[in-house]
């Protein structure tokens, strides 16, 4: 089965073709980073309009790269939510139109399920069950995964997501958008333990996260300290250490609670070098193993949507002809794939 995947949940237009037997045949991606840089963040209306401009040329490119036409495609998967409603509707409209015009089955995919399953695009794939740490600009959650669609949200952020905290702290430091990766680059020049930031909610039972207070602590530290490059690097390093330590502590707690031996990390923040290294060391010490997608599949992309959609289309799941987007969509409400 060959599936065309369409991702338009935020500020990346991602298109891919995935074959059940041959794997990923093609994927194309257009990032709107330059478009939104002057505004310091994503402007929803501009994002939607740019998806409209880019989506059809990217679909043509992905099909050409796979040496296919739409007639060679067996199904279509598009991101249904969560995300920006205008951006979601662009992908949903195009996906549904192609499905209707060419009489193909189509399915709306949960964006975070796409991230959760992104490591399945690699050669070394995790077996079920496993613990998933999903960390991005909009989400931070720990999920117990027994199978596709069999998810239990064990913990999540009660305020800012980890990626959001990275971006907001970077903005406080005067770093250009997108701030998260720039903050991490600056942190690499910092001296470890120069500052001691709190590890939020790690002294309390439970698996939820809270990063808004950490952002406030960073703001106060930035305001109180000199503005030279080394001090800024030290503050960035301390902030990153605090976020990574917090995520690692919660992961270890969740692994103990569930008894799982495999950990998946996915989402934009999963590309963070310090996070990957610390969780890999932790899993080695625990006798387990960590899995994550390659860097290009940590951020939003069409490949993960094509893969996730294929699993559901193979199981006979499809959506009706309605064009729908779900800006909010709890992950644990998804239908299992038997």
From Swiss-Prot:
| Gene Ontology molecular function, alphabetical | iron ion binding; N(6)-L-threonylcarbamoyladenine synthase activity
**Which cellular components does GO assign to this protein?**
cytoplasm
Localization: Cytoplasm
Task: Name one matching Pfam family.
Answer: TsaD
InterPro entries named among the record's database cross-references: ATPase_NBD, Gcp-like_dom, KAE1/TsaD, Peptidase_M22_CS, TsaD
Q: Does the keyword Acyltransferase apply?
A: yes
Which keywords describe this protein according to UniProt?
A: Acyltransferase, Cytoplasm, Iron, Metal-binding, Transferase, tRNA processing
For this chain, the annotated S-S bridges are none
Catalytic function, reaction form: L-threonylcarbamoyladenylate + adenosine(37) in tRNA = N(6)-L-threonylcarbamoyladenosine(37) in tRNA + AMP + H(+)
Q: Required co-factor?
A: Fe(2+)
Indicate whether Cytoplasm appears among the record's keywords. Answer: yes
Q: How is the cofactor bound?
A: Binds 1 Fe(2+) ion per subunit.
The kind of enzyme this is, by top-level EC class, is: transferase
One GO BP annotation of this record: tRNA threonylcarbamoyladenosine modification
Binding of substrate occurs at 134-138, 167, 180, 272
Tell me which EC number(s) this protein carries: 2.3.1.234
Cited Gene3D superfamilies? 3.30.420.40
Residues that coordinate or bind Fe cation:
111, 115, 300
Give the source's domain of life in one word.
Answer: Bacteria
**UniProt family annotation:** Belongs to the KAE1 / TsaD family.
Name the job this protein performs: Required for the formation of a threonylcarbamoyl group on adenosine at position 37 (t(6)A37) in tRNAs that read codons beginning with adenine. Is involved in the transfer of the threonylcarbamoyl moiety of threonylcarbamoyl-AMP (TC-AMP) to the N6 group of A37, together with TsaE and TsaB. TsaD likely plays a direct catalytic role in this reaction.
Name of this protein: tRNA N6-adenosine threonylcarbamoyltransferase
Q: Name the gene behind this protein.
A: tsaD
